[in-house]
Amino acid sequence: MPFSNTHNTLKLRFPAEDEFPDLSAHNNHMAKVLTPEMDAELRAKSTPSGFTLDDVIQTGVDNPGHPFIMTVGCVAGDEESYEAFKELFDPIIEDRHGGYKPSDEHKTDLNPDNLQGGDDLDPNYVLSSRVRTGRSIRGFCLPPHCSRGERRAVEKLAVEALSSLDGDLAGRYYALKSMTEAEQQQLIDDHFLFDKPVSPLLLASGMARDWPDARGIWHNDNKTFLVWINEEDHLRVISMQKGGNMKEVFTRFCNGLTQIETLFKSKNYEFMWNPHLGYILTCPSNLGTGLRAGVHIKLPHLGQHEKFSEVLKRLRLQKRGTGGVDTAAVGGVFDVSNADRLGFSEVELVQMVVDGVKLLIEMEQRLEQGQAIDDLMPAQK
């Protein structure tokens, strides 16, 4: 939980080694990188808004990690965190994002015309398609550190901007605190709304303070374009629909996102972005594009195949269970998406998903016929 600077000053009365957390049983990126020497060097620092090293690492201290999934173990509290604590963040970013160096520059491409194909993924296998990203509004602290007033100001700004969308993007805002328990649960079950703040990662980072104050969901009339407000990021922008037309989903995503950015600019606000890290978000795992393009895909045979994980790795894809991270695949249905966020453009990431999913379907069809898939094994992308 974010503490005041006064409390951080009090901690400095103790020697650095007395304050260093016990990370001996941890499996996360932060624990891998943070040394007592680095801690001693950074512990007295804070960003202009007062975010400290302890605030950055607390979620990773409290959540040692998952035996099979390497969690990140740290968060940013404001745009300046990535610079103030770069000795910690840079190696984590390099480790998490496939060797992305502090000198590398990120590229952005939100032109859906540059996507090749993607409008014909077989709906017998692809049940739904979805593209999401996050955006942070410059000048405000991020959710682990923002005050109630900041959070409410972000909500007000976002709702004003979104209410100007028209055509097939026109919709309305639903504040969490004005929903009934049943309405919330229905939206969560239908994969439209973020979960209640039960995740220890969310709780330990301070993101769930004052819940549900100033949180909510905005969506268009047919629920194909959604914006979550003040969950893990200021904004999460989502385009989704049933079936396999990823091109249509991505086109709506790009158009909506571009319009939202223009609306914010007209109110003299911009999104946090820099040439090195791309779009700045709360979790280092989402830096760059913040983009996750995914499909719910039926792979009952390939999902049981010993080479499934290797195939995904070579295609730079990752799988989750039907209900998201840490859930089981029900009825052979997996959530398959791009593994990368940083160092590739939005179009490149969606292209990897489109091309990869076509190959996964081809492999599934082979296995249905009882045939081998060895000759279809892809090279490492």
Curated annotation (Swiss-Prot):
Q: Give the InterPro entries listed for this entry.
A: ATP-guanido_PTrfase (IPR000749), ATP-guanido_PTrfase_AS (IPR022415), ATP-guanido_PTrfase_cat (IPR022414), ATP-guanido_PTrfase_N (IPR022413), ATP-guanido_PTrfase_N_sf (IPR036802), Gln_synth/guanido_kin_cat_dom (IPR014746)
Per its record, what are the GO molecular function terms? ATP binding; creatine kinase activity
Which ranges carry the Phosphagen kinase C-terminal domain?
125-367
Question: Where in this protein does the record say Phosphotyrosine is found?
Answer: Y125
> Per the record, what are the reactions this protein catalyses?
creatine + ATP = N-phosphocreatine + ADP + H(+)
Annotated positions binding creatine? V72, E232, S285
The Basic and acidic residues compositionally biased stretches are 96-110
Q: Give a yes or no for keyword Ubl conjugation in this entry.
A: yes
Family designation: Belongs to the ATP:guanido phosphotransferase family.
Q: What is this protein called?
A: Creatine kinase B-type
